[in-house]
Amino acid sequence: MTYDFRAEIVKAKNTGSAKSGSHHWLLQRITAIILVLCSLWLLYFTLANKNSDVNIIIWELKRPINLIPLLIAVITSLYHAMLGMQVVIEDYISCNKLRNTLIIAVKLFSILTIVAFIVAVFYRG
C-alpha cells in the first residue's frame, strides 16, 4: 500500500480553477433578483387580465409597458438557467470532452431560444 504524504495544497495545485466562481455566483444572484421582480409583474398582469379575452391579452402584451418586462423575464430566465446548468455540468461531469460539449450545447440552446423569442415578439406577419 502506498501513501501520499504530500500536503493537500500540493495535491490540489494545477487541477484547474474556474477563476470566475465569484463572478458566476454574483450573476446568478442578480438574475434571481430580476426574476423575482418579473414574477411580481407577471402575477399582477395575470390577475389584472384573468377574465380577459385572448385578443385583449395579446393586445396588452404588445404594449411596451408589458412587452419590456416580458422580454426581460424570458431572457433573464434563460440566462439564469444557462448559468445554473453550466455549474451543474462543471461539477458533476468528469469527462472533459463531454463536459465542454454539454456546456456549448446549453449555451447554444439558450442563445437560439432567446433569438427565436425576440424574433417571434417583433415579427409583424
From Swiss-Prot:
| Protein name in the entry | Succinate dehydrogenase hydrophobic membrane anchor subunit
Transmembrane segment boundaries: 25-45, 68-89, 100-123
Taken from the record's topology, the Cytoplasmic segments are 1-24, 90-99
Binding of a ubiquinone: at which residues? 92
- PANTHER family reported for this sequence: SUCCINATE DEHYDROGENASE HYDROPHOBIC MEMBRANE ANCHOR SUBUNIT
Q: Subcellular location, in the record's words?
A: Cell inner membrane
Alphabetical keyword list: Cell inner membrane, Cell membrane, Electron transport, Heme, Iron, Membrane, Metal-binding, Transmembrane, Transmembrane helix, Transport, Tricarboxylic acid cycle
NCBIfam families, alphabetized = succ_dehyd_anc
Q: Which residues lie on this side of the membrane: Periplasmic?
A: 46-67
On cofactor binding, the record's note says: The heme is bound between the two transmembrane subunits.
Pathway(s) this gene product operates in, as recorded in its UniProt entry = Carbohydrate metabolism; tricarboxylic acid cycle
What does this chain do?
Membrane-anchoring subunit of succinate dehydrogenase (SDH).
Q: Which terms under GO biological process does the entry name?
A: cytochrome complex assembly; tricarboxylic acid cycle
State the Pfam families in the record.
Sdh_cyt
Oligomeric state and interaction partners are given as:
Part of an enzyme complex containing four subunits: a flavoprotein, an iron-sulfur protein, plus two membrane-anchoring proteins, SdhC and SdhD.
Q: Which cofactor does it need?
A: heme
Q: Name one GO cellular component term.
A: plasma membrane
The record's GO molecular-function terms, alphabetically, read: electron transfer activity; heme binding; metal ion binding
Which residues are involved in binding heme? Answer: 80
Which SUPFAM superfamilies does UniProt cross-reference here? Fumarate reductase respiratory complex transmembrane subunits
Kindly give the membrane topology term recorded for this protein: Multi-pass membrane protein
**CDD domains, per this entry?**
SQR_TypeC_SdhD_like (cd03495)
